[in-house]
Amino acid sequence: MVISPSKKQAARRHTHSVKIGNLYVGSEHSIKMQSMTTTPTADVEATVTQICALVEAKCEIARVTVQGIKEAQACEHIKERLLSMGIAIPLVADIHFFPQAAMHVADFVDKVRINPGNFVDKRNMFTGKTYTDKNYADSLLRLEEKFTPLVEKCKRLGKAMRIGVNHGSLSERVMQRYGDTIEGMVVSALEYIEVCEKLGYRDVVFSMKSSNPKVMVAAYRQLAKDLDARGWHYPLHLGVTEAGIGLDGIIKSAVGIGTLLTEGLGDTIRCSLTGCPTTEIPVCESLLKHTTTYLDLPKKENPFALENSETFVNASKKITKATPWGSVYGVFIKLMKEHLLNNTVEKLLEQLGINPTNGKKDFTAPDGIIVPKSFIGTSVIEKLKEHLLVFHHHEVPCLYNHNEEIWNSEQVLSAPFVHCHATPPFIHSTREFFEKKQSNEQPVKLVFSKDLDDEFEAAVSIATEFGALLLDGLGEAVILDLPNVSLPTVREIAFSTLQSAGVRLVKTEYISCPGCGRTLFDLPEVTTRIREKTKHLVGLKIAVMGCIVNGPGEMADSDFGFVGSKTGMIDLYVKHTCVKAHIPMEDAEEELVRLLQEHGVWKDPE
């Protein structure tokens, strides 16, 4: 992260400008929003129609899948149709496994995306093959030989390129030497850019995607560091691959992309959500709105104040002693007086995920609640105390911003919690706070509040600001104050943020691709059905992937996979291994359940 001495905040990483069609990306230009079509690319009219819808939604770059020469030729007609309609949105071709398609389509599109894991080398098939130093060196020579024609053609035509590394599809050669590590991802990217540099071609953008936000953030940080150390200031395209469906997908994207944006990294972004591609753009817009604030703060810092506050979120550097709630990362929800006056205890318990009859808690039931002080001692609160920890909102001080005097005050050092109001430069000042306090023997628990009314905006903002700290281990609990959002949704936002940051697993996790022209079934519908069947299997990771091109690789972190193999057929995976092939679609979901039973991870829903 680059810290501006005058503002103590992130500054946007310097990147050179890359021309993509009629626009430029780089630090001198606005951060661009992009998406990808889900129509078969060979269906020119359907693809053009979907791109027009993306343009209407304010998408700035459109990508299409190009799996062969037929699709490459279709791109010529797609581009012609768009231009005839006065639509000049840059068109990007997505290439996997087939360099000839890249060479052909470069004539028609504005940018070519290649995956270093499968452009020249074979995708890792976990065969255990060993590469000697000579084998490895020979492979690099072959890479340069095969990759050079595309680089030379793009340079000659003035076309851009994205070197798009995916954590789940590193080549066999890289995996054998480095494993599926951050180092392996960075090496995979650098091998290709070294060829570009040798040929004097710099119209290149990088991406370092993973379905795991923790891996994704670490990979981008490391690549940016390594590129800058070489004096190579290439732009970055940000994305959490196969983020998923609905609020879970939005939150996972926001944790990864939002964290990096607040650090000044990123020149283009995409939120890979399962469903209609136009739904991705509002999420991108919201992310840019919430994170740009961190890069555009006034030079005069906000006045410091230490006051009482009504809500808090604990963000301590590390757990140094047992927390009152017993969980490493607790979840607390602020209840308004309206919640307490207008609902029965039974209704409140249901909304908080607790069975009022037997007291059984849902996996996403909070650890406690924050209530107005005037309600302490009432019969309602006493009944809620039987199931939850209860705090009132005057028990801890509130830190609206940080300076040395406040950091070292007895009021902060001795408080059980310290509220920190989550307004920019909240993320950066919080990190600085912990850097100064981590050597102090007395644990300081810093907590922060967020008060938002809109469900969608709340999810993006909380996932970005809380997630950015949680990813780096700065946090012990989250407490949300969302009076106009339903309590079940507040719980979902809180626990999805913790799960996406990898600090508390309370739900089944789904890795589902957004779909593209290769998709072989209705992804949103099937993903929703599988979620309903398996959502009670806490801690399990299930991938739902539209095709076998990216599916087996992109579901690297999953325990089980449901992958389209051909039209109307599904393959089922355990980790990286296909264990059941070509299952008719109508039987596949039940076969997945049977597979889970065979591996002893299935249990009937309660």
Curated annotation (Swiss-Prot):
One record GO biological process: terpenoid biosynthetic process
Domain of life, source organism: Bacteria
Positions of [4Fe-4S] cluster binding: C513, C516, C547, E554
E.C. designation(s): 1.17.7.3
Functional note: Converts 2C-methyl-D-erythritol 2,4-cyclodiphosphate (ME-2,4cPP) into 1-hydroxy-2-methyl-2-(E)-butenyl 4-diphosphate.
Entry similarity comment: Belongs to the IspG family.
Protein name from the UniProt record: 4-hydroxy-3-methylbut-2-en-1-yl diphosphate synthase (flavodoxin)
Organism lineage string: Bacteria, Pseudomonadati, Chlamydiota, Chlamydiia, Chlamydiales
